[in-house]
Structures are given as structure tokens and as C-alpha cells.
């Protein structure tokens, strides 16, 4: 709904054949379970061990962004790509392009935007702001937090913004253990280039893999 309301792009729901496949072609779910994005797919054993998840010969590594403290102070829709920009012209890419097209390894970038009851959330923030106001005499940080909450509420009411929750993760894989070490570093470096704090997940990798299955991304 958010994407369609922007007027710039349109999203559509995938058909059943596109999800589960047909007799002649593999569907998105089948390709996801085998980590084979194109061509013929083969059945693969899946090891959901907490310390190391494997699908066939491939080992997975996963990085997440789910805490506001891990995000940069300012998030924009697009950034200047220096390598293709000049003094007279800018090459603009998506803010998340470092973990998308610019990440040169086998990977999947998952992005979840959960639309909650916005009015209910704003009421919770109003209550939190009043609590911060009452506690501001005990700590300057409470006063600062109240100002941030007030600023958020003012913008939400002024521009009719919808309150959402979001989660992002990058799932990468390789059949070579040594290469996987370099991939972990590359993913972390790309997240750091976005001024985000990289968080390498190990224990909950199988859970997040299962949650990212096409059609299984509900809250």
C-alpha cells in the first residue's frame, strides 16, 4: 500500500504458479529452498543447526538491522554514487543499494514493513512524552527524549504520516568456507558504509531464514 500510494512504482501479488511453480518451471519457493535463483533446481538437504545453517553444500551467514539505535541519524531515499558521478551530474542510487546491487556475492536482501494501528501507536507516544515530562526534573536525558518524541508527533500529525515497524536483513551464502569469511566481512563493510551498525546473527539464522520464505513474512 505504501509503495502504490507513492505513485512512482506499482506492486502486484505473485500468482500461484509464480510461487509454487509448474511442471515446466520452478517457482519462487522452490528456488528459495534450493538457493538457486535461475535454471533448474535440485532437491537439497537443509540443516537448521543454530551455529551453522546449511542448504546442500552452501553455508549461510546473516546480518540484521532491527533496532533504531543501529540505524544512521538520517535515512534518505537515495544517495550519490561517487564512482559514476561527476562535478556536473549525480548518479543517484537507492539508500540500500550497498546491500543490493552493489553487493557482489550470492545474497538475498529482505525488507519487512509492518503497518500497525497508527492512531494507537501515536497515543502510546503521547503517553510516553508525558511520562518523560514528569521525569525530566530527575534527568536531562528524559527531557531530551521528550523533545524527540514531541518532534516525531508534530511531524506525524502535520503530514499525516503512518507509524510502521521495520526489519531488514541480508542473507548471504557460499559453498566455500574461506569465501564465506570474506563475504561476512563484505556484508559488514557495506552496512557500515550506510552508517549502520552491522549485527551478525548466528543462533537465530534458521528462524530468520524460515521467516523470509515467500508468503511467510507475517508479523
Enumerate the predicted regions with their spans.
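Extended, folded cores of ATP/NTP-driven motor/assembly subunits in large transport
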Residues: 1-219
